[in-house]
Amino acid sequence: MASDRADAPAQDRSGAISRAGMGIASRSSGGLCSRGRSSAKFLAMRNPTDATAAGDDPLRGTRVVSLAINVPGPVAAARLAALGAEVTKVEPPAGDFLAGAAPVWYEELALGQRVMTIDLKSVAGRAELDALLEQADILIVSSRPSALARLGLERATVCARHPRLCTVSIVGHPSPDSDVPGHDLTYQAEAGLVSPQALPVTLFSDVAAGIDAAAAALALLVGRSRSGVGGWREVALVDAARALAAPRDHGLTRPGGVLGGGSPGYALYPASDGVVAIAALEAHFLARLVGGLGIAHSDASLIAAKIRERRVDEWVTFGREHDIPIAAVAST
């Protein structure tokens, strides 16, 4: 979370990058900095520009300080910013790994936020952070508890110094294993989301945990509005991964499952120039598909033969015209 430099002054690199956004989720926590854990529900959000145009900023005036670098914390902060929160992103002198690894995404996630460099290993840096927290409503951290303790940011200290602060701690595993190291790959592996033949196609655990963390922050704000005190909620990346694995674990997406190849109306089919995804899961969609294709019944081989006759864009248009969920499979 911080570099080895002990004398780096705080630097404001903001210029406020304007606002970014996303969605939501959570599980309960109680009174004065009691510990909670988040589960994985999701609330889709509109484009942040749409929300701004409509004057719909429910978190206007809410101040967020995020010490979380890499992916989960920035995803959470971006979602809160999309709801109107004022976000200050605090980075160590070494910066955020994501800025070098995926600079465009880094900028998108930091959109509209004030970005500062503070060396939290220094006395001056900790004082600078303390001043920010005096005015903040939400704090997002993603270091392991042992690292937070070395910076004087363990739960007991933060709650005692800032009793109204709503703190979300993103960890790999829930307590008492929250000091166990890991990354998105290891959490997905634990949840059974990794194929032995290939790395994951995206950072499912990181992004899902960021969504959960945003929801956890909102839950804490609601709790504070009732009790007058903040709290501390723990969001575990492995929990987020396991939540994403639930459809597979319950058989929906396993081979032969309803969403795993067992339904001819819910499948991928090669067209003449690419591949289309057809999601005619419900009976009315499937009836429209069969009728529109002019085939006798919903046999996968009959559907496949018809789909091969036209281009992808023609099938997308066909789906719109017949009110059937059909999309092109985008290349990566």
Question: Language model features by range: what are they?
Answer:
Residues R46, D56, R63, A68, ...:
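Acidic, glycine-rich segments within the central catalytic cores of soluble metabolic enzymes
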Residues W105-C159:
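A structured beta-alpha segment of the ubiquitous adenosine-cofactor-binding alpha/beta core
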Residues T88:
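Conserved beta-strand positions in the Rossmann-like core of class I SAM-dependent methyltransferases
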Residues L67-A82, A94-A102:
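Substrate-binding/gating loop at the entrance of the active-site cleft, primarily
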Residues L153-H162, C166-E190:
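Rossmann-fold NAD(P)-binding glycine/threonine-rich loop
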Residues L80, Q113, I140, V158, ...:
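Structural scaffold positions in well-ordered secondary structure
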Residues M1-I17:
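Extreme N-terminal basic, low-complexity initiation segments
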